[in-house]
Amino acid sequence: MKLTTVTNVSVDGVTQGHRRIDAGPRHETDAPDEDGSGTFERFGWAPPLLDDAASTFISQTFQRADAFLFGRRTYEIFAGSWGAGMDPGNPVGEALNTRPKYVASTTLTDPRWADTTVLSGDVAGAIGELRAKPGGELQVWGSGTLIRWLLDRRLVDEIVLLTYPVVVGQGTRLFPATGPDLGLDLVDLLSTPKGLTIQTYRTTGRPQYEAATA
């Protein structure tokens, strides 16, 4: 299976606080890894820009997954909403409730969401085994800390970015100031009426750099 990450991100790269997870029913994109504590105050920058085209893309992407991989916090958010029977019949919930789920965690010992496997110990090795299996897609939603960990170990095959036309100006960003370098091939590009761009990239290893000239 190819490992695909799917992330809501602002133009300046912020992933934090794209929704207020404590306000109203949770939506299928409520998967922030960071809870916005401390000085962050600009919650909810994504919903005013989410349109039907983006929502359709999100639903279709969930439905094509063969399995899901989460960090603990994102897993608990999903388990507390979709896993608790929110919005019965929704295709997102159907995918999440009927397909295998894996959680990278050293502290979660008793997952109560059916068909969940906790990955601890040699997490990189376990994820490598999942990637080696035949099939379609192992998807990572939200889980920013996990995504950065996966990128550090070059375990990501595809990166999907839902880029919202807003500069948040503060908050945790998907890509840190210092991290691994990564070459990308653009394999799909969509835009929506409210100005989201949805880019799908295939990772290609380390990028090429211009050679120094005399």
Where would I find each of the regions flagged by the language model?
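Conserved catalytic/dimer-interface elements of ABC ATPase nucleotide-binding domains
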Residues: V160
